[in-house]
Amino acid sequence: MIRLLIADDSALVRKLLEGVFLEEGDFEIRTARTGLEALDMVRAFDPHVVTLDVQMPGMDGLTCLGRIMLEAPRPVVMISSLTEQNADATLSAMALGAVDVIAKPGGTFSLELDRLRPLLVATIRSAAQAKIRPTHRLADRIRHQFRDAASSPRAKAARRGAARQRAKAEPAPGLVLIGTSTGGPAALNILLPQLPADFPWPVLIAQHLPATFTGAFAKRLDRECALNVVEVDVPRQLEPGTVYIGRGDADVIVAPRPSGLIALSVPARRDYPWHPSVERMVDSALEHYDGKRLLGVLMTGMGDDGATAMTRLQALGGRTIAEAESTAVVWGMPGELVRQGGATLVLPVEEIAAAVIEWGNADAAD
């Protein structure tokens, strides 16, 4: 049995969610109305998975999550309304260790429940398999979540602008492709800030997230990274010094234009089950780049999205990195890349950036 704690201040939402999982037959469920009740229930019930609403009376979901991750770490899924404020809070939660997010529908919750049911069940089952490892780094992020880390934003912007101009002096020789899902936002928060502003290759990312959150995620990363970070909400020229985040609920591909190659958001296709699709992103890059000029990184996530395409990328002369099982929240996608024999390197998340920098700089110098 999977022990599930549902924390939401709406009695209707609690009842509806409880009904969904009781029908599955293998869930034992408790509910909480406030963050404080949720903390007490975590201690008493010891759930395998917790769902948290962002907005709750007394103690909000973000504060409750921080306490859970410090005192009794376990998989937490945020269930958030589709507002800009909640999107930012939800991304803060994922930086603190929440493994996934489900967007509440904008209309009547009960009317949308049948559409959401498969996603709800799949997400919670995936979260139940996640491995949460408390670390000093995570504790530090929790304790300093609300402190502004940028002591001199203007100085940082000036340095970043100068480095971008140096990086753009020559056409980008290649492309970094990153795919991730469950646990990905926290992993990207570790990897991307390590890349320098003059990194010579553009970086294209497919992170499985609802559309409401990818724009806010790009803005958050842009504040924390030396590289420019943007959402692919419009066609974007692929340029050095820039990270491109695929828009949620769509796919992101590489496409040609007279001015050069671009990152393009396109409608999701049914033959690719996850979105933004890592597999489709890599397939499109292989149509326009020599395999030797591609670097694939597959990180934490349920399932196998991207593993086959990245194995093909390696066979065509490219290089790939699979996140090690020791740091992946869910070793599904990177594990499948390893099983297919398509991983050039297998590295813990903290070491991936160094390999990306070494390979990118070496190839740029060729």
Curated annotation (Swiss-Prot):
Domain Response regulatory, first and last residues per copy: 3-119
Coiled-coil parts of chain: none
Record remark on domains: Contains a C-terminal catalytic domain, and an N-terminal region which modulates catalytic activity.
GO annotation, cellular component aspect: cytoplasm
A GO biological process held by the record: chemotaxis
Protein name as catalogued: Protein-glutamate methylesterase/protein-glutamine glutaminase 2
Organism of derivation: Rhodopseudomonas palustris (strain BisB18)
Region (Disordered): 149-168
Domain of life where this protein originates: Bacteria
Residues at the active site: 181, 208, 305
Name of encoding gene: cheB2
Lineage start: Bacteria, Pseudomonadati, Pseudomonadota, Alphaproteobacteria, Hyphomicrobiales
